[in-house]
Regions:
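A domain-start/cap signature at the N-terminus of enzymes
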Residues: 1-2, 83
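Serine-hydrolase catalytic machinery in alpha/beta-hydrolase-like enzymes
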Residues: 2-74
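Primarily recognizes the serine-hydrolase "nucleophile elbow" in alpha/beta-hydrolase
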Residues: 62-101
Length: 101
């Protein structure tokens, strides 16, 4: 049984913060393939407007998963915090995947 988790951090809540760090550890021990989104440098770029930041984050997120064959996975989990929840929802809709937990 193939399983994957994609982790979407918040703007001020990174992958090394307790909620995401320990959840990632649990998914790792359960044999999940894991993808970590790391778009904090985009969000912290003071030269970009919020609209440009969000556009660049969406481009980054899609680039990270464009070659993933989600059809081979029996279980797909999106783990997210704050702005990451928005991006996870947008990605799920864009990919047309209904069976995401």
């Amino acid at each position: 049984m193939k399983k994957i988790v994609i982790i979407f951090p918040g703007a001020g809540y990174g992958l090394d913060s307790p909620l995401l760090y320990y959840a990632d550890f649990i998914y790792e021990t359960k044999g999940f393939d894991r993808i970590h989104m790391n778009y904090q440098s985009i969000l912290s770029n003071t030269e970009l407007s919020i609209e440009n930041k969000l556009t660049k984050v969406r481009e980054y997120v899609f680039e990270q998963v464009k070659d993933v064959n989600f059809a081979v996975y029996d279980e797909i989990v999106f783990l997210s915090k704050s702005i990451g929840s928005v991006e996870a929802g947008i990605l799920a809709e864009r990919l047309g995947i209904k069976a995401i937990r």
